[in-house]
């Protein structure tokens, strides 16, 4: 046995006694070994020997269930707990449980919000998308204008397709504008400056900046 392992074995009874008193719950020798081996370097044989020694000295209690022994702290060393103390502990448990549930719910909300933010477009991507949509809208507006001015050259089917496309792109416009607004609002919750200053810093230009109105549905 190495010197460090021998030193650990010599101190095993004290370490295990403190552990059982602090935890105040039953453990098997395997449980104690698994819980203390990494931190204190105790071997399985040293743990079993220390538990048997502590039980023989009356410092801990042991119970045998079939082929397994269970060890736990002597309950006589602990102060008697009154009914009032127990009720107080129960109330504390209820309050802490409610707090934990509230925090878990908050965590779920924040995780959902984070997922939404991380899946959203970045500012450069939004700017590029906006420019592309503006270009497409201008093209379709010009096309629609020409179609309206020359209805004799447009079949009802073509006209209907153009109007359907217009509704489709207007709907997409509204959707992306709403997504952009929600994303900016989420960012602004933790942004120290005003919304106007934020837009100026990242280079966001709104429809209103260019007097662009979203067409009616």
Swiss-Prot record:
One of its GO terms (biological process) is homologous chromosome pairing at meiosis. The lineage of its organism: Eukaryota, Metazoa, Chordata, Craniata, Vertebrata. The gene is Psmc3ip. Belongs to the HOP2 family. It is found in: Nucleus. This is Homologous-pairing protein 2 homolog. Keywords: Coiled coil, DNA recombination, DNA-binding, Meiosis, Nucleus. Disruption phenotype: Infertility. Males exhibit testicular hypoplasia with lack of spermatozoa. Spermatocytes arrest at the stage of pachytene-like chromosome condensation and spermatogenesis is blocked at prophase of meiosis I. Axial elements are fully developed, but synapsis is limited. While meiotic double-stranded breaks are formed and processed, they fail to be repaired. It comes from Mus musculus (Mouse). It holds the Pfam family TBPIP. One of its GO terms (cellular component) is nucleoplasm. InterPro entries: Hop2_WH_dom, LZ3wCH, WH-like_DNA-bd_sf, WH_DNA-bd_sf. Interacts with the DNA-binding domain of the nuclear receptors NR3C1/GR, ESR2/ER-beta, THRB and RXRA. Forms a stable heterodimer with MND1. Interacts with PSMC3/TBP1. Its main location: nucleus.
């Amino acid at each position: 046995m190495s010197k460090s392992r021998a030193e650990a074995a010599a101190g095993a009874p004290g370490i295990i006694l403190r552990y059982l008193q602090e935890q105040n719950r039953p453990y098997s020798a395997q449980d104690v070994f698994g819980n203390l081996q990494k931190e204190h370097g105790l071997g399985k044989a040293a743990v079993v020997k220390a538990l048997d020694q502590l039980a023989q000295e009356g410092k801990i209690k042991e119970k045998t269930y079939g082929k397994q022994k269970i060890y736990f702290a002597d309950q006589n060393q602990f102060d008697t707990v009154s009914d009032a103390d127990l009720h107080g502990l129960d109330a504390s448990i209820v309050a802490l449980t409610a707090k934990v549930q509230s925090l878990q719910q908050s965590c779920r909300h924040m995780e959902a919000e984070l997922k939404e933010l991380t899946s959203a477009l970045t500012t450069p991507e939004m700017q590029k998308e906006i420019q592309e949509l503006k270009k497409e809208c201008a093209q379709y507006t010009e096309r629609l204008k020409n179609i309206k001015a020359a209805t004799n050259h447009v079949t009802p089917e073509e006209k209907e397709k153009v109007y359907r496309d217009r509704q489709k792109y207007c709907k997409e416009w509204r959707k992306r504008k709403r997504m952009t607004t929600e994303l900016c609002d989420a960012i602004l919750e933790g942004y120290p400056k005003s919304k106007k200053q934020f837009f100026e810093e990242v280079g966001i230009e709104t429809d209103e900046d260019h007097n662009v109105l979203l067409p009616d549905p």
